[in-house]
């Protein structure tokens, strides 16, 4: 079962005990905690990746090596793959056998005063971020793709929830993994209280197997 899954689900109405508000067409953001802390070998791998070179990104830095899971951080990769499998089985629920796998993977370093621009991940189905180091008030913020449609008429709100918000954030916690649809816009705002570097691993995924249906003329077989 999910360690924690955040979607717009049932919201209890305060006015009537028998009334419920249903959030349909929810966007699944999955968060899972790894039991073990960073090992000394993993710390060495992180240092090695940094020494290989860091390039400038819009607002922060990313590793020159964009396939870090290929030969480093084996246990973290294994954990991410296990959680990816759970996400696929319980969110996508594919009828046919489909093999999801990690494609590119890279290290992010966000120093105090830096940020990570609003973006999506192209050529990917599910994306993930695993936090190596984070401080209090570090967070990842997601943006509702339907904001333009829902915002045709604006109201001032006295409280925010997953139904009436244009953005929603989750705290960034060391040893936690966040999985989300690759098309979902997300960003990292400046943490004004930061005193240390925020370090994370991001990755993309794709799948092998059968997509679609032959009778609908949208079947795709990837091996």
Q: Each predicted region: which residue ranges?
A:
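Short conserved micro-motifs at the rims of enzyme active sites and ligand-binding pockets
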Residues: 43-44, 191, 212-215
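Short beta-strand His + acidic residue motifs that chelate non-heme Fe in jelly-roll/DSBH
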Residues: 116-119, 186-193
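Conserved double-stranded beta-helix
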Residues: 75-139
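A short hydrophobic beta-strand segment most commonly corresponding to one strand
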Residues: 127-130, 195-211
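Catalytic core of non-heme Fe(II) oxygenases with the double-stranded beta-helix
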Residues: 110-179, 210-219
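Non-heme Fe(II)/2-oxoglutarate
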Residues: 2-94, 115, 219-222
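Exposed beta-sheet edge/beta-hairpin loop segments within beta-rich domains
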Residues: 168-171, 190-194
């Amino acid at each position: 079962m999910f360690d924690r899954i955040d979607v717009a689900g049932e919201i209890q109405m305060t006015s009537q005990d028998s009334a419920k508000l249903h959030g349909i067409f929810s966007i699944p953001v999955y968060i899972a905690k790894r039991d073990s802390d960073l090992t000394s070998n993993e710390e060495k791998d992180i240092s090695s990746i940094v020494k290989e070179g860091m390039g400038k990104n819009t607002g922060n830095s990313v590793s020159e090596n964009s396939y870090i899971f290929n030969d480093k951080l084996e246990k973290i990769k294994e954990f991410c793959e296990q959680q990816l499998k759970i996400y696929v089985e319980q969110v996508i629920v594919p009828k046919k056998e489909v093999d999801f796998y990690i494609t590119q993977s890279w290290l992010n370093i966000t120093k105090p005063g830096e940020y990570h621009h609003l973006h999506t991940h192209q050529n990917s189905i599910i994306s993930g971020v695993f936090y190596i180091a984070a401080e209090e008030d570090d967070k990842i913020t997601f943006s509702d793709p339907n904001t333009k449609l829902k915002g045709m008429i604006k109201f001032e709100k006295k409280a925010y929830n997953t139904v009436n918000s244009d953005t929603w954030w989750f705290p960034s916690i060391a040893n936690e993994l966040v999985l989300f649809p690759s098309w979902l816009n997300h960003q990292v705002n400046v943490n004004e209280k930061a005193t240390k570097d925020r370090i994370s691993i991001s990755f993309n995924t794709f799948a092998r197997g059968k997509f679609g249906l032959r009778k609908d003329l949208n079947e795709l077989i990837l091996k």
